[in-house]
Every structure is written in structure tokens, then in C-alpha cells.
Curated annotation (Swiss-Prot):
Name recorded for this polypeptide: Probable potassium transport system protein Kup 1
UniProt family annotation: Belongs to the HAK/KUP transporter (TC 2.A.72) family.
Topology of the protein relative to the lipid bilayer: Multi-pass membrane protein
Catalytic activity: K(+)(in) + H(+)(in) = K(+)(out) + H(+)(out)
Entry function: Transport of potassium into the cell. Likely operates as a K(+):H(+) symporter.
Annotated transmembrane regions: 17-37, 55-75, 101-121, 140-160, 166-186, 217-237, 249-269, 277-297, 338-358, 370-390, 395-415, 420-440
Gene Ontology cellular component terms for the protein in this record: plasma membrane
Keyword annotations: Cell inner membrane, Cell membrane, Ion transport, Membrane, Potassium, Potassium transport, Symport, Transmembrane, Transmembrane helix, Transport
One function term, GO molecular function aspect: symporter activity
Length: 631
């Protein structure tokens, strides 16, 4: 669900926005109590000293990493109300510096890490919830994985339907989840209030000193309580800063702390219940309802991660970082409701592979977190640069503050390194693959623009050379020539002239530009240049969160009398150019021959039909003009 940009820009607060944020933003971090404390305490003696030390680390991690770093500092780095690593990249593009190529690499690698996280989060969340069946009977344990698999299959198969009809329920359902886990925690804390001493950071420091190297590596388990914190920044554009802050400080944070402390209080007197400390703090009669509530909460958390991945993909496509893969709008009312079939399939295969390979939430936890940790580090570095170059903070303040953040994240990363060999390598390798594909695509488009289109003569000169007015006219015919991002010279129109030696009565050459802001105001939408009496070049500006719809934009332009001539968009013919890219061993355009082959493959498979779909052109009135390019 997306709310109006006016609300976002004014940071308007409503309880509806806060409730919506609760359902989408905090699902991931909100379901961490299912497994985080169990994983952290496994393998060490379950005694009061260790429990207080771990609880103190959890408390201060949530305060420093989420409450202070993300909600107070990182939130400042929004791009016109939009958050996330690609929005941050677009913000950096406002400052043209020598570091811009580095920012591209950092951002696309971070995007790849988030895609890897999108595979692991549904797996560990749903499996950990269904594992609650073991509290009902040991005989139900063999059914945990099949039931979790069925839930995940249904979750991914229903993505094409969208969440418009049930999305409004996410907030109230997650609110029920938070209230439930808070009450369960309070019941235990009242009986054993000694756990409240863990608020004192002394216990965290004493625990790390006493446990030494083993205690340090337990930070990998502690990090699980802040996974999902990155979603707070990514979802600024959906709900705004103030509703997210309100939901965190008044609902999510207190409820999470109460539950973690409640689990700890129970373990102090019943250390044998470490096998499933979350479900064991509930009375036996509440096991089944709690399993149902937990499963619903984890499905919502998984849905939020999947939707965020779709949104990230759309940003990458519009910013020209990846091919124009099919993006389906699942709601006519909310532009944020989208479905990306190919990404959904990749996430599904990855999630099911993790489930079947690791089988339990404990095993999944040994692979989970390192990708999120790396992504947080990358965001820290980019925001630190923004603080110096855009916010004009003093170098000393930036070094002190972000030095602290980097030190904490590096400490977590060091503790998470062992996860690389226990499955954490999968999302990291996937991130490298995705980053390389994005890099090859971006570099290939730039090469195509600079070597095949940039050097073309000005269209007005070519029109004179061809004696445009003496060419055969097609009276009553209006043609719209669409040029891609790499083509600023009207290649489709020029190829049409050379092939036909005749011209439509009205010619409009359309080029679109995705600006480095999420939404473009109507007053800045159009730029028009008249090349001849009946030939115009129109540039349409979009934001990186908008849906490109050329016919709709042209219809609005006609209604506002922006164009010097009249034509009917509903009867006009659209022309698109489809380049056929071939890799050549004789000359080297990109870094490697197989990189050229990859770019050529992507261009061949994501140009013709997908260009027509991407621009929302009518198939029955669109003509594709082929051209041949050898790299």
C-alpha cells in the first residue's frame, strides 16, 4: 500500500499510517523472537549470568543499531521521501564526483544482498513458527518441514494475485502479534523481575569479557535481533518517517524487549526449555493459538520482504541498472502493488532450496544474517559520504559517529564470518552474480550509447539532407517514435526514414528520462523541441518509483496542448527500435568476451516484446524496427 506523496513529504502522521507501517515494516524484525534467543544461547551454559549478558546485548543492539542509527541518522538520507540503497544511489548522483562509479558498484552489490536476504527470511521465519508444533507433541516434528513447505508454496504462488484485497489486514494482525508476545513476556518478568537488571550495559560488557572469543562469536546470534532493521529505511517512501518512528518506539520496541526479557526470565528457572524458549513461555492451553498467530505473522513478514524485493527490482529497472524484465501491476489504485514473475520464481526456488537443505530454524540461522550485515555496512558508508558532501557535516563529527557505526557493524560481521561456510555463502555469491549482471548491463548500455548513437548527426541536419519536405507524405497518419535510454538521437525515426523514404504527416520522437527523484511534478514532466513544422522531439521525465506509461503521458500532453500539432493517441502508430547485439572476438568493447555475450543475450531477450510492455504500448499499433550492432 502506498500513500500520497504529499503525506510523505510533509511527514504527516496518522494512526492509520502507523498501523500500516507496523504490518509491513516490522514484520521481519518482529518475528525474530521466534529463534534469536534460542540460537544465541545454544552451546553455552544456561545460567543467570549468561542470560543477563545476552539480554543486555540484545537491549543495547536494538537501541543503538535500530533506534539511534537507523531511525535518527540513516533516516536523514532519504531521497525526496524515498529510502533504500538504490534511492540512496540516486541521491548520490546529484553530486557528480569521481566516486560515482564506486557508488554504482556498492549499490548494485547491496541490491544483490537484499535479494539473497529475500530468500532466507521467508524460510527461517515460516519454519521457526511451524516448529511450535513440537510443543504440542514430539510426534508432530516430522511434519514441520512439509507444512512449512506447503505454506511457502502457497505464498509464492499467490503473488500474482497481489495483496490489495488483504493488505489492509497486515497492520492489525501484526499488532495482535506484538500485543501477544508482550503479554507472554510480562507474565514471566513479573515472576522473575531480576532480568530487568540486563538494561545495565555492565552485564553485556562483563559477559563478553568473561566468555572471550566464544562470547564474541555469539554476537552472530545477537545480530539476528536487528535483522529486518534495514527494512525501516527501505520503507520510508511507503509510510513516512514519523509513522515508522511512532510504531517502533511505542509498539514494536517495547513488545520485542518484553518478550526477549520474558524468555530470559523463564530460562533462568527452567534452563531445560532452551529447545524452544519462545513457545515455552506460553501456557500449554495457548500453544495452538500461538502457533497459528506466529505462522500468520511470519507469512506477513515474508510477504513484506517479497514485496520489498519487487519494489527494489522496479527501481533497478527504471534507473537502468538491469534489463526491462516484466513487471505486472496488481492493483489499479496503488502503484506500489506490483508483481515481478521472474524475481518471484528465483525467490521461490531459493527459499525452497534453503528449507529443504537446512530443514530447521537452527540450521537456517547459521546461514542467516551475514548478507544483511554486509548491506548495513554498505549503507553506512554511503550515508557517511552523504553526511560530508550533501549535509555538510564536519569531518570530525562524521568520523566519530559513523566510525562508531562501522565499528559495531564490523564487530557483528566478524562474528558472522563463520556463517559463510555454513550456508551464508549462498546469498553472497548470488549478490556477486546479480551485481555483475547489473554492471554488465549498465556498462553495455553506456557503450552502445557512446559508440552507436552519440556520434549521429543532429536530426534537424539529417532532415535537411534528406530534403524532408519533398519526401512522400502520409496524410492523416501520426507516428510516435520511441527511443530508448541509450539513444538520444532518434534512431528509430532515422532508420524509418532510410527504409521508407516517406514520412507520416505528424511525427513525434519520444524519449524518456528517469530522474534521480522518486516522483516528478507535472510542471517538470515534459520538454519539447520542434525540429520541423510537423516533427517534434518530446522528452518525458519520470521518477524512479513511477510506472512508465508512454500513451498515458502523451494523452495528458495532448489534453494540456503541450504539442504544436493535434493527433489522436488512440489511433497513432508507435515505432520502437530493437537492436540486435552481436559479440565480436576481433574487437573488445566490454572487459571480457563472455561479458559481451551476456550483454548481447540480455538485449536480445529483453528488448522486443518487453520494450512494448515496458512502455505500455498497444501491440496492434506498434511496429518494431530492427538494427544491427557489433560490439
Amino acid at each position: 500500500m502506498r500513500y500520497s506523496s504529499y503525506e510523505m513529504k510533509k511527514n504527516r502522521f496518522t494512526y492509520g499510517l502507523a498501523l500500516g507501517a507496523l504490518g509491513v515494516v516490522f514484520g521481519d524484525i518482529g518475528t525474530s523472537p521466534l529463534y534469536a534467543l534460542k540460537v544465541t544461547l545454544s552451546g553455552i551454559p544456561i545460567n543467570q549470568f549468561n542470560i543477563l549478558g545476552v539480554l543486555s546485548l540484545i537491549f543495547w543492539s536494538l537501541i543503538i543499531v535500530v533506534s539511534f542509527k537507523y531511525l535518527m541518522i540513516i533516516f536523514r538520507a532519504d531521497n525526496d521521501g524515498e529510502g533504500g540503497i538504490l534511492a540512496l544511489l540516486a541521491l548520490m548522483k546529484h553530486k557528480s564526483t569521481k566516486y560515482q562509479p564506486l557508488f554504482y558498484i556498492v549499490a548494485i552489490f547491496g541490491a544483490g544482498l537484499l535479494l539473497g536476504d529475500g530468500m532466507l527470511t521467508p524460510a527461517i521465519s515460516v519454519v521457526s513458527a511451524v516448529e511450535g508444533l513440537g510443543t504440542l507433541s514430539d510426534k508432530l516434528y516430522p511434519y514441520v518441514l512439509p507444512i512449512a513447505s506447503v505454506i511457502l508454496v502457497l505464498l509464492f504462488s499467490l503473488q500474482a494475485k497481489g495483496t490489495a484485497r488483504i493488505g489492509y489486514l497486515f497492520g492489525p494482525l501484526i499488532l495482535i502479534w506484538f500485543i501477544t508476545i508482550a503479554i507472554l513476556g510480562i507474565l514471566q518478568i513479573v515472576e522473575h523481575p531480576v532480568v530487568l537488571q540486563a538494561i545495565n550495559p555492565y552485564y553485556a560488557i562483563a559477559f563478553l569479557v568473561d566468555e572471550g572469543l566464544r562470547g564474541y562469536f555469539l554476537l552472530g546470534g545477537i545480530f539476528l535481533v536487528v535483522t529486518g532493521g534495514e527494512a525501516l529505511f527501505a520503507d520510508i517512501g511507503h509510510f513516512g518517517k514519523n509513522p515508522i518512528r511512532f510504531s517502533w518506539f511505542f509498539i514494536a520496541l517495547p513488545c520485542l524487549l518484553l518478550n526477549y526479557f520474558g524468555q530470559g526470565a523463564n530460562l533462568i528457572v527452567r534452563p531445560e526449555e532452551i529447545s524452544n524458549p519462545f513457545f515455552m513461555i506460553a501456557p500449554p492451553w495457548f500453544y495452538l493459538p500461538l502457533i497459528i498467530i506466529a505462522t500468520v505473522a511470519t507469512v506477513i513478514a515474508s510477504q513484506a520482504v517479497i514485496s520489498a524485493t519487487f519494489s527494489l527490482t522496479k527501481q533497478a529497472v527504471l534507473l537502468g541498472l538491469c534489463p526491462k524484465i516484466p513487471i505486472v501491476q496488481t492493483s489499479m489504485l496503488h502503484s506500489g502493488q506490483i508483481y515481478v514473475p521472474q524475481i518471484n520464481f528465483i525467490l521461490f526456488i531459493g527459499t525452497m532450496a534453503f528449507c529443504l537443505a537446512f530443514k530447521t530454524s537452527d540450521n537456517l540461522a547459521h546461514a542467516y544474517g551475514i548478507a544483511v550485515n554486509l548491506e548495513m555496512l554498505l549503507v553506512d558508508a554511503m550515508v557517511a559520504y552523504a553526511a560530508v558532501s550533501i549535509w555538510r557535516w564536519s569531518t570530525f563529527n562524521v568520523i566519530f559517529l559513523f566510525g562508531l557505526f562501522l565499528l559495531i557493524d564490523l564487530a557483528f560481521l566478524g562474528a558472522n564470518t563463520h556463517k559463510f561456510i555454513t550456508g551464508g555463502w549462498v546469498p553472497i555469491v548470488l549478490a556477486f552474480v546479480i551485481a555483475f549482471i547489473m554492471y554488465s548491463w549498465r556498462y553495455g548500455l553506456e557503450y552502445l550509447r557512446d559508440n552507436f548513437y552519440m556520434n549521429k548527426e543532429d536530426i534537424s541536419k539529417i532532415l535537411k539532407q534528406l530534403q524532408y519536405k519533398s519526401l512522400n507524405q502520409l496524410p492523416g497518419v501520426s507516428a510516435i517514435f520511441i527511443t530508448d535510454v541509450y539513444d538520444k538521437s532518434g534512431g528509430s525515426f532515422l532508420h524509418f526514414l532510410k527504409l521508407n523514404r516517406s514520412v507520416p504527416e505528424n511525427v513525434l520522437i519520444v524519449n524518456y528520462i528517469v530522474d534521480n527523484i522518486p516522483y516528478v511534478h507535472y510542471s517538470q514532466r515534459y520538454e519539447i523541441v520542434c525540429l520541423d513544422e510537423k516533427v517534434c522531439k518530446l522528452v518525458i521525465h519520470y521518477g524512479f518509483m513511477e510506472t512508465i506509461n508512454i500513451p498515458r503521458s502523451l494523452e495528458k500532453a495532448c489534453n494540456k496542448n503541450i504539442l504544436p500539432f493535434k493527433f489522436n493517441v488512440d489511433t497513432a502508430t508507435f515505432m520502437v527500435e530493437i537492436p540486435n547485439i552481436m559479440a565480436s572476438k576481433e574487437k573488445r568493447s566490454l572487459s571480457f568476451y563472455w561479458q559481451e555475450k551476456l550483454f548481447a543475450f540480455l538485449m536480445r531477450n529483453y528488448s522486443a516484446n518487453l520494450n512494448i510492455e515496458f512502455y505500455k504500448l498497444p501491440y496492434n499499433r506498434t511496429i518494431a524496427i530492427g538494427t544491427y550492432c557489433i560490439l
